[in-house]
Design a protein with these regions (language model features):
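A surface-exposed partner-binding patch
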Residues: 1-96, 136-245
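Compact, glycine/acidic-enriched structural inserts
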Residues: 103-142
Length: 245
């Protein structure tokens, strides 16, 4: 698993959130993953977070999901759930300690889903990555393609947005991404029809070309990577990009 920037493991005080009696409530590997890498975003879709016992309490009164005899929990039991993650689309991943269930609370669907995981023998920080991949398959009905990477929330991340204006002598954004790869071979490349992200350890971040918008380029970097950032920024400006204020 590629780690985008230096992880921020949980402090001793934060680790105390996971009492020995409660550790079995969480999905396999979750506690070790958090203790090793801290909070962050997994493969661009799941925000892995510390347990939150309060965020779902108001949802027990909102009537967002339908409940019947096949529902894994009742509407009042939503308030008892512990959120451990959110997707970039606003879905919740949570555990319900009293019934020992892992639950998916979707933002754009009417039913809460119980996630049934396959048993696994290993128990390390890589285990939870496999669990998240399995959750993705169950929820979306397909496997997530591409490489496995994790973006820790360091609290020291900076960013710059640029625009590649259209013009006869200008490369397309797709061409610019290819030129960047050739000039600065990345440590990792994640690309699809909508976006291309080139990851660099020197940046502690990545350069993202937004194919969907056709003009947007963004550089995400750690504050102590100023020299590497300056080189990338100067190159992008030399190719016709403009800073977005």
């Amino acid at each position: 698993m590629y780690i985008v920037s230096g992880p921020r493991p949980l402090s001793d005080g934060q680790s105390q959130v996971f009492g020995r009696e409660e550790e079995g409530v969480y999905p396999p590997g979750y506690v070790r993953f958090m203790q090793r890498f801290g909070e962050g975003t997994y493969r661009g879709w799941m925000n892995v977070q510390q347990p939150d016992r309060e965020v779902l309490q108001p949802f027990a009164e909102y009537g967002l999901w339908e409940h019947d005899d096949d529902s894994p929990i009742t509407e009042p039991q939503i308030a008892e759930c512990i959120a451990i993650g959110t997707t970039v689309d606003g879905d919740f991943l949570a555990v319900h300690p009293q019934t020992a269930q892992l639950l998916w609370l979707p933002r754009h669907a009417e039913h809460i889903q119980a996630i049934l995981l396959q048993s696994r023998e290993r128990n390390d920080e890589g285990l939870y990555a496999a669990v998240l991949d399995e959750i993705y398959r169950q929820v979306y009905g397909s496997s997530q393609e591409g490489v496995v990477y994790y973006e820790p929330w360091t609290g020291t991340r900076s960013h710059l947005f640029l625009r590649l204006p259209p013009g006869e002598d200008q490369p397309s954004l797709l061409e610019l991404a290819g030129m960047c790869q050739a000039s600065f071979p990345p440590d990792l490349c994640v690309e699809n029809e909508y976006t291309c992200s080139l990851f660099y350890r020197e940046l502690g971040g990545y350069v993202r070309f937004n194919y969907a918008y056709q003009q947007e380029v963004a550089v995400f970097y750690e504050q102590d990577a100023g020299q590497a950032f300056a080189v990338i920024e100067a190159w992008l400006l030399s190719k016709g990009c403009e800073r977005v204020s």
